[in-house]
Amino acid sequence: MSEPELVRLAKQGDIKAFCAVYDQYKSKLYSYAYYKLGNTQDAEDAVQACALTAFEEISKLKKPEAFCSWIFRILYCCCAAAIKRQIKQRNTYNIEDYKNIPADDNESIIIREDIKRALSKLSDEEKSIVLLSVTAGLKSKEIAKVTGLSAGNVRQKLSRSLAKMKKELT
């Protein structure tokens, strides 16, 4: 069954259809949230909040074909709320938070830490655009829907952000 068909069924209250379409995005949602928030617990909480909100609000989704950008918009908002909580709580990121992320070897851990360091040099908006592109695989048009920017602005910011990261990583 195609994604739009599953979404149509989910809009009618079919829980299995919702789970099937949600499961297609779960790992990408988690990757985005993890790199955006910096630790496993907050990422898991944001993805869970996103799933709950998406399930409760799916009947309001006008275009089943837009499910991808719609669910990432929900996660984008969940992550923004989590960041506000982090600021209030003055959370500090600890290397222990990264031990639960599977890695093939020590080199993978080093590379992941280098990427996190490079991402930390970007503004929240730049980081979101890069993560939506790289971890979620969204196109400029879809990122524009999630962030509220124009597709041209997204392409420009993505290019500049990737250049900043490249400079940081070399």
Role assignments for model-derived ranges:
Residues 19, 47, 144:
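The alpha-helix within a helix-turn-helix
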Residues 11-12, 49-66, 85-86, 168:
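Sigma70-family region 2
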Residues 31, 45-52, 56, 65-77:
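Structural recognition of an alpha-helix C-terminal capping motif at a helix-to-coil junction
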Residues 81, 89-112, 116-117:
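Internal acidic/polar
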Residues 24-27, 35-38, 131-138:
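Short helix-capping/turn signature of helix-turn-helix
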Residues 7-31, 121, 127:
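A short, charge-rich alpha-helical start-of-domain segment used by transcription regulators
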Residues 59-63, 73-93:
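Arg/Lys-rich amphipathic alpha helix in sigma70-family domain 2
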Residues 80, 126, 135, 141, ...:
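DNA-recognition helix of helix-turn-helix
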